[in-house]
């Protein structure tokens, strides 16, 4: 019941806001409406299943957001937003995205590093507190390695294109269809 990975994400950390997130998702179930699903919407309830882990519940919530047509990066940004409220240098469109979506979904705050994939995208997001390490290496021959620490795989130093680490609230994202790293601006 508590095994990972789940459908879309895995999780290194703890969702400190889990009880509140779980309660709000239960309340939302009573308010859900959808023209496409109609009465069949009841078949997907409950969204979050009692007695599952914080990670499992977050994955179930992510699955719901994806079923509404959102992309995986968009849904992850809704669940684990940056600290945007007082960010003076953030792009106004990005800030508007966070402000709008804060009315739809409250943050699932960690400390957490959350890798995720749907086959088109693979990435990881570090919560806004930034208390879980996430380091990555990109090789010249096309590999991306991410872990909580460097050196988990032996890589010829001549083959390293770049090293980095996730910053608090930031996302590392690879578009698998295009074979490229998507910058988090």
What annotation goes with each model-predicted range?
Residues 1-185:
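Conserved short alpha-helical segments that host acidic/polar catalytic motifs at enzyme active sites
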